[in-house]
């Protein structure tokens, strides 16, 4: 299982342009299966970008907790499925209510979308 984060604005823009968007109640997910050359040459299989807006919550502690929850969810989903061998990139943008929702419900929703579209 090899997951790395998107590092700069250029990488985020590439995934936004190449990816397909899915709008859910608690998050927006952008998945790109066709990756540019810079990603294909990498040793990592999964590229993850997380955008947590200050509009979501003013406190940095809460925003960081949301990021930790998302990273943990992705680790669970990628390790439990056939996604280990597939190279793909995704961006997750949480919406209002993300921090209050049950972890198992988030896991179910996110894994259903990812597994269906990869």
From Swiss-Prot:
It holds the Pfam family Ribonuclease_P. This is Ribonuclease P protein component. Its EC number is 3.1.26.5. The lineage of its organism: Bacteria, Pseudomonadati, Pseudomonadota, Alphaproteobacteria, Rickettsiales. InterPro entries: Ribosomal_Su5_D2-typ_SF, Ribsml_uS5_D2-typ_fold_subgr, RNase_P, RNase_P_CS. It catalyses: Endonucleolytic cleavage of RNA, removing 5'-extranucleotides from tRNA precursor. Belongs to the RnpA family. RNaseP catalyzes the removal of the 5'-leader sequence from pre-tRNA to produce the mature 5'-terminus. It can also cleave other RNA substrates such as 4.5S RNA. The protein component plays an auxiliary but essential role in vivo by binding to the 5'-leader sequence and broadening the substrate specificity of the ribozyme. The gene is rnpA. Consists of a catalytic RNA component (M1 or rnpB) and a protein subunit. PANTHER family: RIBONUCLEASE P PROTEIN COMPONENT. It comes from the Bacteria.
């Amino acid at each position: 299982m090899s997951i790395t984060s998107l590092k700069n604005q250029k990488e985020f823009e590439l995934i936004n342009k190449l990816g397909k968007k899915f709008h859910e109640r608690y998050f927006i997910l952008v998945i790109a299966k066709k990756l540019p050359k810079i990603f294909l040459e990498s040793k990592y299989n999964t590229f993850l970008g997380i955008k947590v807006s200050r509009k979501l919550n003013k406190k940095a502690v809460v925003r960081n907790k949301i990021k930790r929850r998302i990273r943990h969810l992705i680790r669970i989903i990628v390790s439990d499925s056939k996604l280990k061998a597939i190279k793909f990139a995704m961006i997750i943008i949480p919406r209002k209510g993300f921090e209050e929702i049950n972890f198992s419900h988030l896991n179910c929703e996110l894994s259903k979308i990812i597994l269906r579209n990869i």
